[in-house]
Amino acid sequence: MAESVHSLFDRTAETYDRARRRLIPCFDELYRAAIEALPFEREDEIEVLDLGAGTGLLSAFVAFSYPRARITMVDAAEHMLEQARERFALGGDRFRFEIADYGEGRIAGRYDAILSALSLNHLPDEKKRMIFGQSFSALNPGGVFVNADRVLAETPELERRLHDSWLRRARELGVGESDLRQALERMELDAAATVGDQIEWLRVAGFREVGLRYRNLIFAVYSGMK
């Protein structure tokens, strides 16, 4: 049986964060764009859900930008989420952790923001649409959904060119061949979709002010408001 996405991420949990900045040449801009999509004041007490939280990288950006935010991190890769627990060990009950496959269940609770980074691309399109609908239902009025993710280009030729550019840039930044090989192995299990399709699915789910916030090579940030 082919190895699952969750087990692949568990197997690379220890080195995942270290390689991230080289595997994502636009790392800072990508995560900054996700945070800038949040329409809140710094001192607001917001409830945030991080889907596919992994080691807690995106949640760390949220926690720094919103020091009174309460953040729930969900991931099916237990070892990855253990890294997140260690990252936020001094945070008390401000941070919650749930080992679960969010693509197989329902989103429980009410939130002001539901975010994800480099996770939804692992789900087939019908499950992406399901998550968009569940997210809309789980958000408070005025809440926001934000996804920073790997996306598919609009044509096969453009996809090939962007993928080649990403590979070249990652190598220029010094990514280790082992880390790159593991990333390519994970990407073989991806089900990335175009930005246009995902924006349309958000609209169908009921979101307003839907749009692209950032795009660079094979990465993008898009969002929608309830």
Summary of predicted features, one role per range:
Residues 208-226:
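Core SAM-dependent methyltransferase catalytic element
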Residues 129-141:
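A short glycine-rich, Lys/Arg-flanked "PGG" loop and its adjoining helix->strand segment in the class I
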